[in-house]
Amino acid sequence: MSVNGENKVSGGDSSSSDRPVRVYADGIFDLFHFGHARAIEQAKKSFPNTYLLVGCCNDEITNKFKGKTVMTESERYESLRHCKWVDEVIPDAPWVLTTEFLDKHKIDYVAHDALPYADTSGAGNDVYEFVKSIGKFKETKRTEGISTSDIIMRIVKDYNQYVLRNLDRGYSREELGVSFEEKRLRVNMRLKKLQEKVKEQQEKIQTVAKTAGMHHDEWLENADRWVAGFLEMFEEGCHKMGTAIRDGIQQRLMRQESEENRRLLQNGLTISKDNDDEQMSDDNEFAEEDCVNVSNKGIETVKK
């Protein structure tokens, strides 16, 4: 793999100003995560013009000196090829760097965090001891809180849940390696689902009860105000109704009086003022009696 910066190299003169600085970073890169990506990014940005080579150890050497990986060497190589900071992937990278390897790939600097990396091969105390001694080591910073070991520990901690999830998704017990525990795990899975349903129903019941309690409290707080408001509106309506009835009766009596006066004048008779006063008094009593009856009926309705 090459980049624009690499194409500028002419011949083998490492002193050329156009030649990018060749930086090498290596690792296992199992379960590639953002901690790996940040370390690679730091290596890439070590110099303004950097060509980054990333070495990845194969399965054989990794299993021998570090332990079993989750991903195969091919999967780990491919993960690195899809990281935007990587210019070139070097498969089958050596566990301990040598002068021959650095010269072969024309490596100017090796990037890694400064913590001593134990050399389990027995060649030395620190895998990067040699490049540090010749001044070709470029320090990067580790990302705290994330590592392949941390991810594996999370899976181990919640092992049963992940097994149950995959059984539920159709994986066989042979694929998961749980042939002796499958029945117990499936029973646990059903019990867990039942517990979740019971919990869900309990939450719904609590929500309904809480809502009902709120409505009950609201009614108790506002009942007196609502009833008082209704009675006030009802009394106002009765008053308006009584006024309308009285006005209507008075207008009718005035029309009757006018017609009677006109008829008596035509007959040449004199209207007696005393008789008129007596009739007006009777009509007013009739109007007041109607208003009282209407008010009494309204009050009886409210009581019901």
From Swiss-Prot:
Record's catalysed reaction(s): phosphocholine + CTP + H(+) = CDP-choline + diphosphate
The protein's name in its UniProt record: Choline-phosphate cytidylyltransferase 2
Family annotation (PANTHER family): CHOLINE-PHOSPHATE CYTIDYLYLTRANSFERASE 2, CYTIDYLYLTRANSFERASE
Pathway annotation: Phospholipid metabolism; phosphatidylcholine biosynthesis; phosphatidylcholine from phosphocholine: step 1/2
General function of this protein: Plays an important role in the biosynthesis of the phospholipid phosphatidylcholine. Catalyzes the formation of CDP-choline.
Keywords from the UniProt entry: Lipid biosynthesis, Lipid metabolism, Nucleotidyltransferase, Phospholipid biosynthesis, Phospholipid metabolism, Transferase
Summary of temperature dependence: Optimum temperature is 30 degrees Celsius.
Consequences of knocking out this gene: No visible phenotype under normal growth conditions.
Region (Disordered): 266-292
Molecular function GO terms recorded: choline-phosphate cytidylyltransferase activity
UniProt similarity note: Belongs to the cytidylyltransferase family.
EC number: 2.7.7.15
Organism (species): Arabidopsis thaliana (Mouse-ear cress)
Induction summary: By cold treatment.
